């Protein structure tokens, strides 16, 4: 439930207009709520004529994701946002081939135990199974719509790549597309625009490996993996895009930092976590 204080400057708004223009609800989100003005249920088409308290209750959505107890590393949680540090080798969301033992199953279980309710995980971002790090989950449709439209979400990754990158910084702008039904993505002239900024953090001369920070400006599937491979510096352990044999058990890619505008406070929230031990190269 959301609670908003109606002030004089909101007089004349329809409730739907107030929720969209002032509180950043989406049109779709308004179809999933019930609203109460000073305790009385009203329609969203009602015009605001006096000060008061507006309560917005979201209708519960159903989920077919089975609750399964899976350890969660919760980095941040409030009434709108949940952020977890996903461990490597864990699928984010059920697929046709993997229907349980995913992060989504664990999140549904967490809220079932905590609140006794069925929870629909609204993932803002997802990570490949072998990629570790921060995942943002909206806890309601209001937060989901705000993050998508006004959240100014920034995502930063650490990656260990083959070879020594001589440049200290570079920006890669190469379109990415899918060829046929293959899982693999490639640089294609008619692909979707994709932009990644790469900053060199440390060069490991002895092991011929470079640690880089990657900031995503777009969110294409496998974007960092494709762009770094295109540079000639595939990520260690990347079996799909790497052309150099190694004995690394997973791709060395970690979502280590996110920042976003919080949907309720409108303040910038930034969170950062360290890398897993397997990425701490010598």
Predicted regions and their residues:
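RNA pseudouridine synthases
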Residues: 1-282
């Amino acid at each position: 439930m959301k609670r908003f204080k109606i002030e004089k400057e909101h007089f004349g708004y329809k409730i739907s207009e107030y929720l969209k223009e002032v509180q950043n609800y989406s049109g779709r989100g308004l179809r999933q709520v019930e609203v109460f003005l000073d305790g009385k249920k009203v329609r969203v088409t009602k015009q605001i004529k006096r000060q008061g308290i507006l309560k917005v209750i979201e209708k519960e959505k159903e989920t077919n994701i089975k609750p399964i107890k899976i350890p969660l590393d919760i980095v941040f949680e409030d009434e709108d946002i949940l952020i977890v540090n996903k461990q490597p080798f864990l699928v984010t969301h059920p697929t046709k081939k993997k229907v349980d033992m995913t992060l989504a199953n664990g999140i549904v279980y967490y809220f079932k135990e905590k609140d006794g309710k069925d929870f629909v995980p609204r993932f803002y971002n997802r990570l490949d199974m072998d990629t570790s790090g921060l995942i943002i989950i909206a806890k309601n449709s209001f937060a989901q719509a705000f993050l998508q439209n006004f959240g100014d979400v920034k995502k930063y990754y650490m990656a260990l790549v083959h070879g020594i990158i001589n440049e200290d910084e570079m920006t890669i702008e190469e379109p990415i597309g899918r060829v046929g039904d293959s899982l693999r993505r490639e640089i294609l002239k008619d692909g979707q625009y994709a932009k990644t900024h790469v900053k060199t953090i440390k060069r490991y001369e002895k092991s011929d490996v470079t640690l880089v920070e990657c900031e995503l400006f777009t969110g294409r599937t496998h974007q960092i993996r494709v762009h770094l491979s295109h540079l000639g510096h595939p990520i260690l352990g990347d079996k799909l895009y790497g052309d150099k044999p190694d004995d690394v058990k997973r791709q060395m890619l970690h979502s280590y930092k996110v920042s976003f505008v919080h949907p309720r406070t409108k303040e910038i929230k930034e969170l950062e976590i360290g890398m897993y031990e397997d990425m701490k190269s010598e």
